[in-house]
Amino acid sequence: MVDREQLVQKARLAEQAERYDDMAAAMKAVTELNEPLSNEERNLLSVAYKNVVGARRSSWRVISSIEQKTSADGNEKKIEMVRAYREKIEKELETVCQDVLSLLDNFLIKNCSETQYESKVFYLKMKGDYYRYLAEVATGEKRATVVESSEKAYSEAHEISKEHMQPTHPIRLGLALNYSVFYYEIQNAPEQACHLAKTAFDDAIAELDTLNEDSYKDSTLIMQLLRDNLTLWTSDQQDDDGGEGNN
């Protein structure tokens, strides 16, 4: 029998050492024990995989940019090598995303009770995020499928959060942040992105007195990110130019 506490301890240790693959493996094993995760365990899982997938997303962007420049040069051998390397990174990224999505579907979302709204929103947001990361690298029909899955998860989380969570709750705010980025970057729908981000920001401002002391820092940081994105996106619309949001 695997000792759950030992696995969690290992994940904490791996985080301090910035060994995120080890951290993710430990938290995957904890999740597969098929018991609900505590808030700390949930966050450890999220941080681990965010860093693991983040490294691949960053590499993919760099190589994609090099690929575009190389295509212009017309050096066939180099073009082929860069393309093969991009595809290798894509496969790694897809494997990580599928790992997370299967943990969410087979254990985490499945095991949420009807009244565990916070956990349900957290995990559905995560589901939306990892389908969004797949959408960043997918093309054609495959892209259409993952975009639809991402939208569905975000939308369900959004409805639950509006009904059961304070507008200042960091998980509700974080969901609005990522959902609006999905609209802007993946759906190419700047008006929807701005509307969602502005509504979330305004609703939180209107209820600042409900800010929980424990989550004050998290909530205000996400509100700042929402505002930064709004500033960027509205200026992009005025310039009629594309831009990138955070997250």
Curated annotation (Swiss-Prot):
Source taxon at top rank: Eukaryota
Site (Interaction with phosphoserine on interacting protein): R57, R132
GO biological processes: protein localization; signal transduction
Gene Ontology cellular-component terms listed: cytoplasm
Annotated keywords: Cytoplasm
GO MF terms, alphabetically ordered: phosphorylation-dependent protein binding; protein kinase C binding; protein sequestering activity
Subcellular locations according to the entry: Cytoplasm
Biological role stated in the UniProt entry: Adapter protein implicated in the regulation of a large spectrum of both general and specialized signaling pathways. Binds to a large number of partners, usually by recognition of a phosphoserine or phosphothreonine motif. Binding generally results in the modulation of the activity of the binding partner.
Subunit structure: Homodimer, and heterodimer with other family members.
Protein family per UniProt: Belongs to the 14-3-3 family.
Protein name per UniProt: 14-3-3 protein gamma-A
Organism: Xenopus laevis (African clawed frog)
Encoding gene (name): ywhag-a
